[in-house]
Design a protein with these regions (language model features):
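Short, glycine/charge-rich beta-strand/loop segments that flank catalytic centers
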Residues: 14
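N-terminal signal peptide c-region/cleavage motif recognized by signal peptidases
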Residues: 17-19
Length: 412
């Protein structure tokens, strides 16, 4: 790995005080919001990462990639050790923590980080130090379009997710006779919301669907009352929010407070798939739809799901969701590449990531598989659409993998 001169100096100093990596372990840095408004997301991500590491290191014999346990066999049974860092949802804090993990903790790779805005800075640091960054759950499509060599993303991005939404609108309209004619876009003001809205506008235009309102708001706002009034006035067929947890809760409560019941809500995941959201708004969440990369109800096609969910639930007292399913998968894929590299050399790990070709049935995800293109994007990740029924998300699309029929009130 060709590190900058100042980084080499930092490493020499760190090694001099005895913090070199042990040969019997593989140290990976995980960056998440452990404090602040999305602290619960960070806590859940930590539990997911620890579950994945336990599957790899332990003896659970789960029917999935690296599920036999015992550590990484091509590294003599070396165990995965995770070092967690709190970026607090702040891109600059994320930058500093990524650099600390590389220069002081000597991690061989980074993984994270929930908010796409933090991934933008983390991945820049990773590229500068030539250390792989595995994007577990960042969905902004611009992240893999910056010419970075060390960026890899297992999950679909928001263009892929949005395409699934508009495919659903087309197919549910044809199936029921109740077509979507208008949408309201509602999005927070960071790279996540902006990129999501841009993709949705383009696809709405292509589908001949009117964008009745395009509402941009400041993330973690204390109030969304003005924005809720705009949504009510637009009265579109579908509200399409791109919001983190606290904003998702405010939105649903605000709509209820003004007496407005949307015909349909199609969320860009994020806060809408968190148990904290469902718990906070209760029956107001019923019928909410979201794109997802993970389907808990797909255990027939993915037999590892029940075992992995049980291990995660024992640790965190809740089932896997879209975010935690992606986080587990990303760490397993990263660990598999390190194992295939047979080395802690970052360049060899990168080469192994480039060569990744994992069938979907070796994962817990409803994907064709994992294979990265030249930009580091997994091209074989296929989203699903889910809907909350009885406080639980159920897969409703594609129709051939649906566990439940969609409740569709548009046009009624």
């Amino acid at each position: 790995m060709q590190r900058p001169a100042f980084a080499i100096a930092a490493l020499v100093l760190a090694v001099g005080i005895g913090s070199a990596r042990a040969a019997d372990e593989v140290v990976i840095g995980a960056l998440y919001p452990m404090t602040g408004p999305n602290a619960q997301v960070g806590a859940d991500a930590k539990a997911a990462m620890e579950t994945a590491a336990d599957i790899i290191n332990g003896n659970h014999n789960v029917p999935m990639l690296l599920g036999k346990g015992g550590g990484l066999d091509k590294l003599g049974g070396a165990k995965i050790r995770l070092i967690f860092a709190d970026h607090q949802g702040d891109p600059q804090k994320a930058r500093a923590e990524a650099e600390r993990l590389i220069t002081q903790e000597h991690v061989v790779a980074l993984i994270g980080s929930y908010q796409s805005a933090t991934a933008a800075t983390i991945s820049q640091v990773a590229d500068r130090y030539e250390v792989p960054y595995m994007s577990a759950d960042n969905s902004s499509p611009s992240l893999n379009q910056r010419g970075l060599k060390w960026f890899f993303r297992t999950s679909p991005h928001d263009v892929m997710f949005t395409q699934a939404m508009f495919d659903f609108f087309r197919d549910i309209g044809a199936k029921t006779g109740h077509k979507v004619s208008s949408v309201v876009l509602f999005h927070e003001d960071t790279i996540f919301g902006t990129d999501s809205s841009n993709a949705q506008k383009q696809m709405a235009d292509a589908a001949g669907i009117k964008v009745a309102a395009d509402i941009r708001y400041r993330g973690n706002s204390p109030s969304l009352s003005a924005e809720v009034q705009q949504i009510k006035a637009a009265d579109a067929d579908v509200i399409m929010p791109s919001s983190y947890t606290s904003d998702a809760i405010l939105l649903m409560r605000g709509l209820h407070d003004v007496g407005y019941t949307p015909k349909a809500i199609m969320a860009q995941s994020a806060g809408f798939v968190e148990q904290a959201f469902i718990d906070a708004v209760g029956p107001l969440a019923e019928g909410v739809m979201s794109r997802s990369a993970f389907a808990l109800d797909a255990s027939k096609a993915r037999p590892a799901i029940p075992a992995v969910d049980a291990l995660y639930k024992a640790r965190n007292n809740k089932d896997l969701n879209d975010n935690t399913g992606r986080e587990i998968t990303a760490l397993v894929v990263l660990a598999d590449a390190i194992n295939r590299a047979g080395s802690l050399d970052e360049d060899k790990i990168r080469q192994a990531l480039v060569a990744t070709d994992i069938p979907g049935n070796q994962t817990i995800m409803p994907w064709k598989g994992v294979k990265f293109d030249a930009t580091g994007q997994n091209t074989e990740a296929s989203p699903v659409i889910q809907q909350i029924k009885g406080g639980v998300y159920h897969t409703i699309y594609p129709f051939d993998v649906a566990a439940e029929p969609a409740v569709w009130n548009v046009g009624k």
